[in-house]
């Protein structure tokens, strides 16, 4: 989104009227967003708490009231499952010792199995409600902790399983437990709430409506063990996550101050989740972007682009990329933090998704004003972009094409000539054969901007010859543009027709240039016709 003033300025100053400013500054494209829409490996939205072997051994030695886990197998099973009738009897007994022992058995079942029997647990009448009841036992913090662990692992399951925990009334009690005097109980409550918030936007909003944020943020005000901080910032990121719809900004924006100092924690997991939270908060209208900027996080986010762990770099880059979708002033804040050198470094990343996001970020900078385009030129970024345009994976080439076309749309004559001298014409022509209609349009728009400049030069120097027509012909661009006159997309064939008519005259179409289709590469193949070796006969 752009401010009205900026939009009017762009519509007047950009040579290319077919790409409007909102198109040029792209928050997210609707198609082809594998990276942005897939579940990231770097960040789990739900986590199951699994005891270590050491913890299990310690518990078995210290627990004198219950059976060892191995003995569960020898006990009488309830019909059809792993839950024993003794476990059910014990959990509903009035003995605190038996309640604790049975709860631990349930917890072990839900922690150690590759496929924990969550459905069996939640279908056992009254069991989930009983665990929620145990959460209220302030006089027995161990029972609170074990019950919270059981419910955490139930909530780590699917949406239906998570909903059972919510319907049992666990969320308000978990939020109360964030203020428990026992750190184990606090941490397990954070974990459970993170799982519930991570299930869906509906669950996230319910947890926010239960007023989780004040006690959750209060946790960060004291010295915590590292696992507590990790769980708390992960839960915080889940509360900020989601786009359909996003969380109510007023309910999550109070966490910005905490996130700003979490960016200086050395732990990689904490840094990654803090950056993810900021990337979610900055993904939206300019007022949200401004709130993130006002939190003072931009310089640190740019510094984290050079972190040695991709788990941190990916969300930091996403947050920086979101901020530069704002207006020119907001984009300038990132540029003033020396972001371009870091982005140039990321363009040579061996990780394709990082290269792609860096190109996307740069494309939103080149959608800015001419001074901002010049900073990209001065940072020597365009040679790398043109190389990517020729050699990278297609999804990355698409983002590089946007970056170059945006620069031809808003750039000065000198800036466009610089891009031509770097060799941008041939890779733009190569994109005219791809199956992706949007990128064909982007390439056509870039070439049109270049041709328009050439026409102005021809008039100015009096030659009447557009110097860029020949360069496009040499790159077999004219053949491809002619073929696009029969494209199924109306905007593409109209644009191709207009370019041929306006810049290349009305030559007869040569049927020999009709291309074959290479479906494996998602593009058309043109034969490159060459003059005979002996030359033309006079």
Swiss-Prot record:
GO molecular function, one term: nuclear localization sequence binding
UniProt region (NLS binding site (minor)), positions on chain: 318-406
IBB domain mapped to chain residues: 1-57
Residue(s) carrying Phosphothreonine: 3
Residue numbers carrying N-acetylmethionine: 1
Role according to the record: Functions in nuclear protein import as an adapter protein for nuclear receptor KPNB1. Binds specifically and directly to substrates containing either a simple or bipartite NLS motif. Docking of the importin/substrate complex to the nuclear pore complex (NPC) is mediated by KPNB1 through binding to nucleoporin FxFG repeats and the complex is subsequently translocated through the pore by an energy requiring, Ran-dependent mechanism.
PANTHER family assigned to the protein according to its UniProt record, in alphabetical order: IMPORTIN ALPHA
Protein name as catalogued: Importin subunit alpha-5
